[in-house]
Regions:
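Cleavable N-terminal export/targeting peptides
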Residues: 1-30
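Outer-membrane beta-barrel pore domains
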Residues: 2-4, 64-67, 109-117, 213-367
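Short hydrophobic/aromatic segments of transmembrane alpha-helices and their interfaces
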Residues: 9-10, 74, 166-167, 271, ...
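Outer membrane beta-barrel
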Residues: 29-194, 201-203, 210-218, 278-281, ...
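Short, contiguous, pocket-lining structural segments
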Residues: 167, 197-204, 230-237
Length: 367
């Protein structure tokens, strides 16, 4: 097995090699090696995307994760990933994002209300693979949820209430063991929900199982249990996601979450749970539609700040004029049994309401 460090490409050597190529050889039609080819030959894969949007809300999109303004054009995310992941031995992944979404991720990682830092190392970890065992050390995205941070992994523009109430990243250790070709188990230990570092010893355990018996059905279940470093008390969270591919064009997804934060000197704690269901239909090579319906019960107001029951319905139309670009048009309606949405903010007061509406358009380019 070749050691990973022997795969490095030295810039000086590339420049020297380029200078040594006679101009006549290029003129004669000799093939030119591209950077992408050099990376591929060295075992490094690269991928990326740019997502930008315009959206308008009747209020300020309270309890949404990334689309939090009233009326705006914005760069959602520009992402780039480099990965060296051989089937055995050492490897590494670096995944960086920039844009408005990165500010939200940075704020979550610093346990602050907001951040002006529009750049984030979303994932950065080393890994070691031996047989059915993969060990990762560093920062990685969560196992929880049907939706992900990268817009390329979602069928809707906006994220669900469930996504808002889930962790996004973890920093620590994760081990995945493939029991069979269709069953894997995951265990890990990390700093907790989104924390890149903590000043003392509180840690969170990560547990998961993934079942993929055939191309029609898959099921994942994951749990996070540990003392939260900021809320200073135990937090328990369980999530499961089931996917059913009825045909090559029609799929259904159901996601259920349950969580509890114990009370402490700094928080009253609370329980929450919710369920989201998705239906996705690709009716041609260029057109698709995605529907999402959701119910979220924040009994004690720990997640949203208001004890309330939330519901939402979302429809997203996707159009792919070419294979690496998608245009999305979305409509969403949120309701609550309490006035928990911010409708307007003035110098004198904040106006609350029990519903909010959003329309959005997003373009996603992948490379």
């Amino acid at each position: 097995m070749q050691k990973p460090f022997t795969q490095r490409i030295h810039l000086t050597a590339l420049i020297a090699a380029a200078g040594a190529v006679p101009a006549g050889a290029l003129a004669a039609g000799s093939p030119v090696t591209t950077l992408s080819q050099l990376l591929t030959d060295s075992g490094i894969t690269e991928s990326g995307y740019v997502a930008a949007s315009y959206y308008h809300s009747s209020g300020y999109n309270t309890d949404h994760q990334f689309d939090t303004s009233h009326d705006t054009f914005q760069l959602d995310q520009a992402g780039l990933q480099l990965a060296f992941q051989p089937k055995s031995g050492f490897g590494a992944v670096v995944d960086v994002i920039a844009g408005e979404d990165a500010k939200i991720v940075n704020a979550a990682e610093s346990a602050s209300a907001s951040s002006s830092n529009a750049f984030d190392i979303l994932q950065g970890y080393a890994q070691y693979v031996t047989g059915p065992l993969t060990i990762q050390a560093g920062k990685f995205t969560t196992l929880a949820g049907a939706e992900v941070i990268a817009p390329t992994g979602n069928t809707n523009f906006s994220r669900s209430f469930l996504f808002y109430a889930e962790p996004m990243t973890h920093t620590g250790l994760r081990a995945t063991y493939a029991l069979t070709d269709t069953v894997s188990v995951i265990v890990g230990i990390n700093n907790g929900w989104n924390y890149t570092k903590v000043d003392y010893g509180s840690k969170t355990g990560e547990f998961g199982i993934a079942l993929n018996p055939d191309k029609y059905f898959s099921l994942t279940a994951q749990a996070y249990i540990g003392k939260d470093p900021v809320d200073l008390a135990s937090r328990t969270f369980f999530d499961t996601v089931a996917t059913f591919n009825a045909t090559s064009a029609l799929s259904f997804v159901v996601s259920y979450d349950w969580g509890r934060q114990d009370a402490s000197a700094v928080t009253a704690g609370g329980d929450w749970d919710g369920i989201a269901a998705y239906a996705n239909y690709q009716w041609s090579s260029q057109w698709r539609v995605s529907l999402r319906g959701e119910y979220f019960d924040d009994r004690n107001g720990f997640i949203t700040g208001t004890a309330q029951k939330l519901k939402e319905g979302t429809i997203t139309l996707g159009y792919d004029p070419v294979s690496d670009f998608e245009l999305r048009l979305e409509g969403r309606y949120d309701t609550s049994n309490a006035p928990g949405f911010v409708k307007a903010v003035t110098a004198a007061s904040t106006v609350l309401t029990d519903n909010q509406t959003e329309i959005a358009m997003q373009g996603v380019f992948k490379f």
